[in-house]
Amino acid sequence: MNEQPENLRNFTINFGPQHPAAHGVLRLVLELDGEIVARVDPHIGLLHRGTEKLIEQKTYLQAIPYFDRLDYVAPMNQEHAFCLAAEKLLGIEVPRRGQLIRVLYCEIGRILSHLLNVTTQAMDVGALTPPLWGFEEREKLMVFYERASGSRMHAAFFRVGGVHQDLPQKLVDDIEAWCDPFLKVVDDLDRLLTANRIFKQRNVDIGVVPLKEAWEWGFSGVMVRGSGAAWDLRKSQPYECYAEMDFDIPIGKNGDCYDRYLIRMEEMRQSVRIMRQCIQKLNAPEGKGPVVVEDNKVAPPRRGEMKRSMEALIHHFKLYTEGVHVPAGEVYAAVEAPKGEFGVYLVADGTNKPYKCKIRAPGFAHLQAMDHICRGHLLADVSAILGSLDIVFGEVDR
């Protein structure tokens, strides 16, 4: 008697929202056929705060802290996109030293993000040592954030027209001294994970994304580079002073989780290269000077000036009560954030507040393909794939 039972149906389980491998407040509804994933249904919006609407009611200066709270793993990279958009509309050029400080801190943010991703990726598949080493380095980087802006995470350090304040020379020297020991830590992580048999079994040929599909789904950043395209906005559409920096773009060939891991490891080394060049340029005579534009309609005057000049005092008062009036127009500015292309589409109507600020978060496009990538994989592979997409919920839900 070998009749098939009639009522075979797939098993549905909840993954998250409080699952340790769910990276924040993700809820996945998984439809399983045995242990094979038949369907993935991501439920988002658990961290939605209406950021885009809130920005419409704030001046351009007050809008900056909202960007720290999107991808809160690498905050300054988001502020960068918003400031670039506003600067395009205002038609202002950031002073050289301001550009170098921005690039330096954006690369620190990239390392912060990749360290977290690579080490938690290892933790998701069962390795417990990498996160301990990685977080030790992240701690040092957060101290650099704190010494520049007073805050470890939500820095609000970038300004329209430059950065809030200059870096002390001691801080620049300390960042330079940090570079060499950090590369040794990356090598240690490399030795621990790259050739590790278990790590490879969990990541090689898992979550393969062919290049054609990566473009179709709107992927960017590591997700397209892992599939073999040398697409990096820092090279293809250089902004600030990236055009004069010498660095390489690592690309993968298989488009699987393992290639994406290798790319993030190599990108950390390239970021250190860029940081070294920034520090060298900051220490050179032409790297000295103002860090924010001298135009008092956009940036506040110096304290000493305000004590002497009534006009400077009025400028300061107007700037912080009313804010800067941005000429009407619309603009799209994108930066190569650690997760991918982070874009800001800004519509100004000539007032002191943005008319509309559309945020293009890279993680959103990556998460929407979760169903497509996971089908046919085992349940245990879901957390490995999710980790390699590098999703942070602040920017997905915004």
Curated annotation (Swiss-Prot):
Name assigned to this protein: NADH-quinone oxidoreductase subunit D
InterPro entries named among the record's database cross-references: NADH_Q_OxRdtase_suD, NADH_UbQ_OxRdtase_49kDa_CS, NDH1_su_D/H, NiFe-Hase_large
GO function terms (MF aspect): NAD binding; NADH:ubiquinone reductase (non-electrogenic) activity; quinone binding
Family of this protein: Belongs to the complex I 49 kDa subunit family.
UniProt keyword Transferase present: no
Compartmental location: Cell inner membrane
NCBIfam families referenced in this protein's UniProt entry, alphabetically: NuoD, PRK06075.1
Top-rank lineage group of the source organism: Bacteria
Pfam families, per the entry: Complex1_49kDa
Reported function: NDH-1 shuttles electrons from NADH, via FMN and iron-sulfur (Fe-S) centers, to quinones in the respiratory chain. The immediate electron acceptor for the enzyme in this species is believed to be ubiquinone. Couples the redox reaction to proton translocation (for every two electrons transferred, four hydrogen ions are translocated across the cytoplasmic membrane), and thus conserves the redox energy in a proton gradient.
Gene3D superfamilies associated with the record: Cytochrome-c3 Hydrogenase, chain B (1.10.645.10)
Gene expressing this chain: nuoD
Topology within the bilayer: Peripheral membrane protein
UniProt keyword terms in alphabetical order: Cell inner membrane, Cell membrane, Membrane, NAD, Quinone, Translocase, Transport, Ubiquinone
Cross-referenced HAMAP family: NDH1_NuoD (MF_01358)
Major subcellular site: membrane
EC number(s) on file: 7.1.1.-
Entry annotated with the keyword Transmembrane: no
Subunit structure: NDH-1 is composed of 14 different subunits. Subunits NuoB, C, D, E, F, and G constitute the peripheral sector of the complex.
GO cellular component: plasma membrane
Enzyme's top EC category: translocase
PANTHER family assigned to the protein according to its UniProt record, in alphabetical order: NADH DEHYDROGENASE [UBIQUINONE] IRON-SULFUR PROTEIN 2, MITOCHONDRIAL, NADH-UBIQUINONE OXIDOREDUCTASE 49 KDA SUBUNIT
Catalyses which reaction(s): a quinone + NADH + 5 H(+)(in) = a quinol + NAD(+) + 4 H(+)(out)
